[in-house]
Amino acid sequence: LGDVYKRQDLREWKREDMEPHLEVVITLSKGGYVKRILSSTYRAQHRGGKGVKGQRMTKDGDIVPYIQVADTHDTLLFFTDKGRVFSLRVFEMSADQSRTSRGTPIANIINLGPNEKVTAMITVSSLLEDTYLIMVTKTGKVKRMHLPLLRNMNKAGLNTFKLGKDELVSVSLADENEDVVIVTREGLSIRFPSDQIRPTQRGAGGIRGIRMKTSQDVVVYSDVVNDDGYLLIVGRRGKGKLSAFRHYRSQNRGGSGLLTLKVTSNTGKVAAGAIAVSYTHLRAHETSLHL
């Protein structure tokens, strides 16, 4: 009888019961290679240094725009330019690889369609009722959606945004009282309260978040913010600008915003953005690059 109970207990165990809790870094290259390695592999360094060799690229021009720090029991959410989302437990990824390995093709992990690519990657520990997703498109449309609407996801993923010919470029997690910041390729930015975006269902479209001054301008970065921390903006020529969020006044959604980086031949167009939690330390966060 004792052996029967032991077999029943073993059958009731889930894989997550067997997996240790480890802090890892998840990277996804623009070329579509994803990998996880232990966070202890990296160390903090000073600005201007040579750095340490990271993910090996399979071709010239590939970059790593998406980075997340996660626990192995967290869930990864992959959002695509078509507005679909796929989920994966971190411990389901291949075992930790070396810092210089190229990783695994993301198409081997999630069911991407033809010409579909991942444009945002976030991690969650649970689908909290009071947490929202803030989604931003290439043309500046925004959408706010309750995170629990992503429950019961299967391998086919879920449609989260009615886009038409637009593309989803950024997804962030937000609480009820946080602000949204959007930055464009021409150096404009806008900050507005997230509660100016009415929560909608998965199949709904978006509303205007920022009004572009030219038809050539596109969104390159978005995140949720408050008065603490800094916004780092980087141009294509590697020039960066770090500004405290307290200097970005909150505006009404849908305006043209303010100039955050004067685009010149010396800076190049805005390529990326990131949040700095202090003047010296960047927060690990995905960035949307349109190079």
Protein language model regions, located:
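Conserved small/polar residues in nucleotide/adenosyl-binding loops
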Residues: 1-8, 280-287
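Nucleotide-binding motor/catalytic cores of P-loop/tubulin-like NTPases across gene-expression machines
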Residues: 43-57, 250-269, 282
